[in-house]
């Protein structure tokens, strides 16, 4: 691999050539920049590569930035831009102008028209950078979009269709997952993933890599089980019942713990397959009780569990743990237990960013993680020299026996620096630590600003003022990244910004980020860490005897470069463990990634296809083969097809009636027979859809196939997740857990594809039949007139007095039996039956329309029956209704019932009037013509 020095020398020569074009670029008029952009695009169309035009493109962008922002990029920023275009990580110190550096590769790659994504860690930075740099891109004739969580799908699509899109890493990943859940291709918002520039690349690609992106949906709650698992966890004791690995923060039941679990839940064997759910709940309860701390991984606010970003200290609103861990934490903290979520779609950041054709990133600290960048993302980390030498003083750590002693010394040093007026930034690793330090500062009557998970709304504003005289800022971890701390006038003379770190972080890189807040662009500064044996890192990596010796120091401390190196070595060990953990996440996700790519690619094909017959045909072959397997029995060690059973389940249902005989199944290989059955399936399917418009069919097919894909993919993710959570137990059987997982996940995936095929074939058969029936019913509802009713009565021999459900069904049953061999006549009879039954329904609806919703409908219906006095609706006269009404009125004293009776009379009179109209039409028809009316095409259209 080429060394950084050689690369920087090579890129430095290119940067010199860019700077040499400055006099020429100064001659450009403002309107010339758009013309240059058009010229560059034409050069690419004519076969030039991005590298071929890089020098002139960067020179034009440099001049545009100078005119718009008043910033003339210096050589190191141009070198950073060249590194980014090469698809690598540029390590640039704080204050070295990363925002300006990103303009050059973004402009160059936007010329291809394939889109550029500039990724930030929060929406504030996305908005800020898009507004500032957007003015430069506007002069260049390049469109800029801003993506955010509050945008509609249309707004997101517009943002992604711009030449350059600013977005947060989380929103970018969630948009990708949501795009692969849409039911119509036009609903997608993203284009193909081409090129992205990631700001704070270490935060996105390393720190957040352990947490996958998950889109969840609701499922049933199991509140009592969560509480039971939590109560069980409370009965356990460390060492006696549990093995807790402090280094990896993993919690396991030991042999005694397993015995207790069996007793508590009345189980014979906790690890039996039927107890998978219980085991999963127990493991989550153990994590919640013993591995997660309030104020570190999460906080409780307003009866709700809120997740804390471990690397910035910010609350992650809208985010929750999946697979029941959120509910386990809710049970632990005794807050309302929410509905458990099931994973609908998921991807790790590692596998998401590997979908891009090219990725690049900028950060102040990444060299310590270069091995991971190379192995996971195939990107190098190239350190760019600072524009001015770093003169900040990094002092050795002060190591104490107790946290109390460390914080006392911290307050002394803060008071001393504050008396001089020097600004101070105190960095902590958690909200809990931040609040503890705040109490010490308040006790010393010091005024300070705080940024942590519970107070981050004014983050950028507080960080920007942290360089003012007398400012004291208490920040959780790397809150405020992306916002420079500029020294106020006179601060440099006071020694610059003091950075005091309380407790070392898990990674040297994060410590370096904290140090790097001081001493930007050649400013003076000082950094120092206060370490105690109570710190998490020390508890995990120092021997009890060592901790005891330090505690004997009291308030005294050790200031030793040797011990500082020992702490650094512990961090290196932890970095290796964290890398292994992230690599482990990736190894398990790789199998899902391959499966996800297959599913998403097939999904896209289905969304874009205008003809799905090939897809359906393949599924029919799969379904046919599975049917053959299902109806095969083991005879003398060989599976033999039960031919009679097989014929019964397919004949007339999945294949045309009498298409196969039992003899047709003789002497055939199962796959050959499956192909024959599938061909017959397609034959019947095409016959059933022959009368349905193509545009209706494609929509129906697409929906059925996508529904099956999504349903079974979701189920697969859930099963695979549960499989992974317990796979570590395989190591006790001397098996390789990853190898077992890959094998079982592959089998699950193959089974999932079979289930999809079976469901699609079955649902297509059922739904298409319903569509045919619905289409018939839709047609028969078109323009059904009194003349149509008249013709049906004449054809079928029905009388007006027969207009009730029982008489209609009885007569049509007789006619269908009579014409059972005449398919056309049968079709017409079915339509006529539905028309007549529809007429009865219409008469009933008319009655209901008159009855006000506020009235007692049941009472009125009973009164209508009494008014009819057991006389058929077709025979009763208006006079009889009035007579019955008068008789009933004399017997009613209740005003409410009298009102109901009046309504009932009106309803009945309307029904009788309708029947009289039908009778009159029948008489007129019989007078005109006694033979069957001519059945012309227009009547067929109206009725059928």
Swiss-Prot record:
Residue runs in coiled coils: none
Annotated stretches, region: Disordered: 920-944
GO CC annotation terms, alphabetical: cell envelope Sec protein transport complex; cytosol; plasma membrane
Keyword Translocase: yes
GO molecular-function terms, A-Z: ATP binding; protein-exporting ATPase activity
Purpose: Part of the Sec protein translocase complex. Interacts with the SecYEG preprotein conducting channel. Has a central role in coupling the hydrolysis of ATP to the transfer of proteins into and across the cell membrane, serving as an ATP-driven molecular motor driving the stepwise translocation of polypeptide chains across the membrane.
BP terms from Gene Ontology: intracellular protein transmembrane transport; protein import; protein targeting; protein transport by the Sec complex
Enzyme class: translocase
Species: Mycoplasma mycoides subsp. mycoides SC (strain CCUG 32753 / NCTC 10114 / PG1)
Nucleotide-binding listed as a keyword: yes
Record's bilayer topology term: Peripheral membrane protein
Quaternary structure annotation from Swiss-Prot or TrEMBL: Monomer and homodimer. Part of the essential Sec protein translocation apparatus which comprises SecA, SecYEG and auxiliary proteins SecDF. Other proteins may also be involved.
Protein name: Protein translocase subunit SecA
Subcellular compartments: Cell membrane; Cytoplasm
Binding site for ATP: 77, 95-99, 484
Stated family: Belongs to the SecA family.
One Pfam family, short name: SecA_SW
SUPFAM superfamilies from the UniProt entry: Helical scaffold and wing domains of SecA, P-loop containing nucleoside triphosphate hydrolases, Pre-protein crosslinking domain of SecA
PROSITE patterns listed in its UniProt record: SECA_MOTOR_DEAD
EC number: 7.4.2.8
Compositional bias ranges of the Basic and acidic residues kind: 933-944
Protein keywords: ATP-binding, Cell membrane, Cytoplasm, Membrane, Nucleotide-binding, Protein transport, Translocase, Translocation, Transport
Catalytic activity, as annotated: ATP + H2O + cellular proteinSide 1 = ADP + phosphate + cellular proteinSide 2
Gene: secA
Highest taxon above the source species: Bacteria
HAMAP family: SecA
């Amino acid at each position: 691999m080429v060394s950084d020095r050689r690369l920087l020398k090579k890129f430095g020569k290119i940067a010199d050539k860019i700077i040499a074009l400055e006099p020429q670029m100064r001659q450009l008029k403002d309107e010339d920049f758009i013309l240059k952009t058009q010229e560059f695009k034409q050069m690419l169309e004519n076969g030039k590569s991005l590298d071929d035009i890089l020098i002139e493109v960067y020179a034009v962008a440099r001049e545009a930035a100078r005119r718009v922002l008043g910033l003339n990029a210096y050589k190191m920023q141009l070198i950073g831009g060249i590194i980014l275009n090469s698809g690598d990580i540029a390590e640039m110190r704080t204050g070295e102008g990363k925002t300006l550096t990103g303009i050059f590769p973004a402009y160059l790659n936007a010329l291809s028209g394939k889109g550029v994504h500039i990724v930030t860690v929060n929406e504030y930075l996305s908005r800020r950078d898009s507004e500032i740099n957007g003015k430069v891109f506007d002069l260049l004739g390049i469109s800029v979009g801003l993506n955010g969580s509050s945008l509609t799908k249309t707004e997101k699509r517009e943002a992604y269709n711009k030449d350059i899109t600013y977005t947060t890493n989380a929103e970018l990943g969630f948009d990708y997952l949501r795009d692969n859940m849409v039911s119509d291709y036009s609903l997608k918002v993203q284009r193909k993933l081409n090129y992205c520039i990631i700001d704070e690349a270490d935060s996105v690609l390393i720190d957040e890599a352990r947490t996958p992106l998950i889109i969840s949906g609701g499922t049933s709650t199991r509140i009592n089980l969560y509480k039971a698992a939590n109560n069980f966890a409370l009965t356990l004791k460390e060492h006696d019942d549990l093995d807790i690995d402090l280094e990896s923060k993993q919690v396991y039941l030991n042999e005694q713990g397993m015995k207790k679990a069996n007793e508590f839940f009345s189980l014979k064997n906790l690890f039996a397959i039927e107890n998978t759910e219980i085991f999963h709940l127990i493991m989550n309860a153990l994590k919640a009780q013993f591995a997660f701390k309030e104020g570190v991984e999460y906080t409780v606010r307003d009866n709700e569990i809120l997740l804390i970003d471990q690397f910035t200290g910010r609350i992650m609103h809208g985010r929750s743990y999946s697979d029941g861990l959120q509910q386990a934490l809710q049970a632990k903290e005794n807050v309302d237990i929410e509905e458990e979520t099931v994973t609908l779609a998921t991807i790790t950041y590692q596998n998401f960013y590997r979908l891009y054709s090219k990725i690049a990133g900028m950060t102040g600290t990444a060299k310590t993680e270069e091995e991971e960048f190379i192995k996971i993302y195939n990107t190098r980390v190239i350190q760019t020299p600072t524009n001015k030498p770093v003169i900040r003083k990094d002092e050795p750590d002060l190591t104490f026996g107790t946290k109390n002693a460390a914080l006392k010394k911290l307050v002394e040093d803060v008071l001393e620096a504050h008396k001089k007026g020097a600004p101070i930034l105190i960095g902590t690793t958690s909200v809990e630590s931040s609040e503890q330090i705040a109490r010490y500062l308040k006790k010393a009557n010091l005024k300070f600003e705080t940024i942590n998970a519970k107070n981050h709304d004014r983050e950028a504003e507080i960080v920007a003022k942290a360089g003012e005289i007398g400012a004291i800022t208490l920040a959780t971890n790397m809150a405020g990244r992306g916002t420079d701390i500029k020294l106020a006038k006179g601060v440099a003379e006071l020694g610059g910004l003091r950075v005091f770190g309380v407790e070392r972080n898990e990674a040297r890189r994060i410590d370096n980020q904290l140090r790097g807040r001081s001493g930007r662009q050649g400013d003076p500064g000082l950094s120092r860490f206060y370490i105690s044996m109570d710190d998490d890192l020390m508890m995990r990596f120092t021997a009890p005897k060592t901790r005891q010796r330090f505690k004997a120091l009291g308030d005294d401390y050790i200031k030793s470069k040797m011990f500082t190196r020992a702490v650094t070595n512990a961090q290196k060990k932890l970095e290796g463990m964290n890398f292994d953990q992230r690599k482990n996440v990736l190894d398990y996700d790789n199998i899902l990634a391959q499966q996800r790519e297959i599913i998403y690619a097939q999904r896209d094909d289905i969304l874009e296809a205008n003809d799905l017959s090939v897809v359906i045909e393949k599924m029919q072959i799969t379904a046919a083969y599975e049917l053959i397997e299902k109806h095969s029995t083991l005879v003398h060690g060989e599976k033999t097809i039960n031919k009679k059973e097989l014929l019964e389940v397919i004949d007339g249902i999945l294949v045309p009636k009498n298409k196969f005989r039992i003899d047709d199944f003789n002497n055939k290989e199962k796959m050959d027979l499956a192909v024959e059955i599938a061909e017959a399936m397609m034959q019947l399917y095409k016959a059933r859809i022959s009368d349905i418009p193509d545009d209706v069919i494609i929509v129906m097919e697409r929906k059925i196939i996508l529904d099956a894909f999504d349903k079974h993919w979701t189920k697969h993710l859930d099963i695979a997740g549960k499989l992974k959570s317990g796979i570590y137990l395989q190591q006790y059987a001397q098996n390789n857990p990853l190898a077992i997982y890959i094998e079982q996940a592959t089998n699950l995936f193959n089974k999932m594809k079979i289930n999809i095929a079976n469901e699609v074939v079955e649902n297509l058969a059922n739904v298409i039949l319903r569509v045919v029936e619905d289409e018939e019913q839709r047609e028969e509802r078109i323009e059904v007139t009194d003349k149509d009713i008249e013709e049906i009565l004449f054809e079928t021999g029905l009388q007006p007095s027969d207009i009730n459900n029982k008489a209609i069904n009885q007569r049509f049953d007789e006619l269908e039996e009579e014409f059972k061999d005449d398919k056309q006549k049968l079709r017409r009879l079915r339509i006529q039956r539905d028309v007549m039954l529809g007429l009865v329904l219409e008469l009933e609806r008319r009655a209901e329309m008159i009855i006000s919703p506020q009235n007692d409908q049941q009472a009125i219906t009973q009164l209508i029956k009494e008014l009819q006095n057991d006389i058929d609706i077709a025979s009763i006269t208006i006079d009889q209704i009035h007579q019955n009404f008068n008789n009933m009125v004399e017997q009613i004293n209740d005003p409410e019932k009298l009102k109901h009776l009046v309504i009932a009379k009106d309803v009945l009179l309307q029904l009788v009037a309708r029947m009289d109209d039908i009778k009159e039409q029948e008489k007129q028809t019989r007078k005109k013509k006694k033979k069957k009316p001519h059945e012309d095409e227009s009547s067929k259209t109206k009725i059928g």
